[in-house]
A protein has these predicted regions:
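Immediate N-terminus of the mature polypeptide
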Residues: 1-71, 178, 186-268
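Extended assembly-interface regions of large multimeric machines
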Residues: 1-175
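Carbohydrate-recognition loop of C-type lectin domains
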Residues: 2-21, 25, 300-373
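Extracytoplasmic
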Residues: 95, 213, 333-335
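Flexible glycine-/small-residue-rich
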Residues: 102-104, 220, 237, 326, ...
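Residue-level signal for inorganic ion chemistry
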Residues: 117, 181, 313
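Acidic, glycine-rich low-complexity/disordered segments
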Residues: 136-183, 197-198, 211, 215-216, ...
Length: 373
């Protein structure tokens, strides 16, 4: 399929169809029956109407043919659908991450805690949320916690009707992460597919479409349970701003939530990001999808070769460039180094990733590498 050219809409247009119709009429009936093809003629009106319909039909046929192949498709949603066939999920927008320093002006007699998902922000209003509880131990002045750009929402997205393969859309666009689905006060489990599950497994899968709308999909009652008729479905998700979250040092300085000590007293704290936030990226481009989907299929969902490591690193959200090197130094053996760059603050720029992003990438690669690597 490499090098496949798009079908060009040049062989037949409206004018060509009109001309072809007139020639066929002349050949079939001769000039004695119909020789007036001027635009004010009623017969010409019928020819023009037929040409309009035929022109439209040919356009859609060409378009359909182009959208049926990975190399020639131009619509993002069609590419997403084709990538499902080879097990590749195009990268959605990714939120930036950064380490946040949290400090107090003087030591406190008890621990001071800022709970997970507390909101902090830049002066421009860009919101970050802490990923874990941040605790300043008694007698200490500061601690650090990782934070991710974006805002978390919980929403009731619908009511089950008890049928197979129910789908529910999240109301907001810009979804970067679907965190939890709760039905009847019970959290259901995420699954990549329904293949290996039974009717008792309370599972769901998710999709984020070309317009960054999140969708929750349930199974058929055989390979995964169906939510009972009348049950409300609640979803918790994050909405982010992609590359805009790659903010400069010393810009995340506002606290939107409250820190408290062990007695429940409110404690004044300060926050700051001493490093660049990194890893924020826009949805994968159409050109990148066409390039990387075949490469990902060749990995067969495991890291073995040098190219596999590069492919999986590039597949991780927030990584703009990756290069895997084997035996870089003399006497090293089969040691693999992966050099990566994250997305910069502006589109088509790159930056050095922070430690938070690099550690997250290593955890991701651990799921696919060989046990001996």
């Amino acid at each position: 399929m490499a090098g496949l050219k798009r079908f060009t809409y040049t062989n037949k247009d409206h004018a060509d169809i009109v001309e072809d119709c007139i020639e066929r009429i002349k050949q079939a009936y001769g000039s004695e029956y119909w020789n007036d093809f001027e635009e004010d003629n009623a017969g010409r009106m019928l020819i023009e109407a037929f040409a309009y319909i035929a022109d439209l039909l040919l356009f859609y046929l060409d378009h359909q043919a182009n959208e049926s192949y990975l190399d020639t498709a131009a619509e993002r949603q069609n590419l997403i659908n084709m990538c499902k066939l080879v097990g590749y999920t195009p990268k959605n927008a990714v939120s930036a991450q950064v380490a946040i320093k949290i400090s107090i002006s003087e030591p406190h007699s008890s621990d001071v805690a800022l709970p997970a998902k507390s909101q902090i922000s830049t002066n421009s209003g860009l919101i970050f949320e802490t990923l874990n509880d941040a605790v300043i131990k008694a007698g200490d002045l500061f601690t650090s916690v990782n934070a991710v750009e974006g805002e978390t929402f919980t929403e009731n997205i619908g009511v089950s009707d008890g049928t197979k393969y129910q789908e529910f859309y999240i109301s907001r666009s810009g979804v970067v992460e679907i965190q939890e689905v709760v039905i009847n006060n019970e959290a259901w489990n995420y699954a990549d597919s329904f293949v290996e599950y039974s009717e008792e497994d309370k599972i769901y899968t998710t999709e984020i479409d070309a317009w960054q709308r999140g969708k929750i999909i349930f199974s058929d009652g055989k390979n995964g349970a169906i939510p009972s008729n009348g049950e409300y479905i609640s979803v918790t998700y994050r909405v982010g701003n992609g590359i805009k979250g790659n903010v400069a040092p010393n810009t995340i300085i506002n606290v939107r939530d409250i820190a408290k000590d062990a007695e429940g007293n409110t404690i004044q704290i300060k926050v700051v990001n001493e490093d660049w936030a990194s890893g924020g990226s826009e949805p994968e481009s159409i050109a990148s999808i066409k390039l990387r989907a075949p490469r990902f299929f060749m990995t067969q969902d495991r890291c073995v070769t040098q190219q596999d490591y590069e492919t999986f690193a590039m597949n991780y959200g927030g990584i703009a460039k990756a290069k895997a090197v084997v035996r870089e130094r003399s006497g090293e053996g089969n040691f693999i180094r992966i050099y990566v760059l994250s997305y910069g603050q502006k589109i088509n720029t790159v930056a050095v990733p922070n430690e938070t992003l690099k550690n997250s990438l290593l955890e991701y690669l651990d799921n696919y590498k060989m046990l001996t690597d």
